[in-house]
Amino acid sequence: MLQHIQAGHPVSVVVTLVDGLVVARSVFHHSMNYRSVVLFGRGRLIEPEGEKLEALEILTEHILRGRWRDARKPNRQELDATSVVAINIESASAKVRTGPPVDDEEDYQLPTWAGVIPLRQQALEPVADPRLRSGIPVPGYAARYDRTR
């Protein structure tokens, strides 16, 4: 894949979030409620060490704000073993499915439950590494982590 990107070939990135299982009266009409996006463009490897470190910091801080300043920064060996790709987005496509099942008209009379089982991704209480030295508290950014920001 990295050779493909380095050669300047087009790339795509797909992200899908499943919001619910749609349970119809007929197995044929079972589905999922979801949000999906496909990005199309051309990628490039981020190679200069300073730019790569900056990209890793931005990514780390996006995932867990405050972590970059607390964690050990990547050493030379780790940086050399890590590839970072930037994608110049040329176009995008999104698709969303929401709502209840859509059954065949005659199936609405069946004595079979139908509906949606909502799903969500949820951050739970942090669990300390079993090898964590004693006396190191859970940092605020981990204790108060919220994926809805």
Per-region residue spans from a language model:
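C-terminal edge-of-domain segments
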Residues: 47, 51-149
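Short, structured beta-strand-loop surface elements
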Residues: 1-58
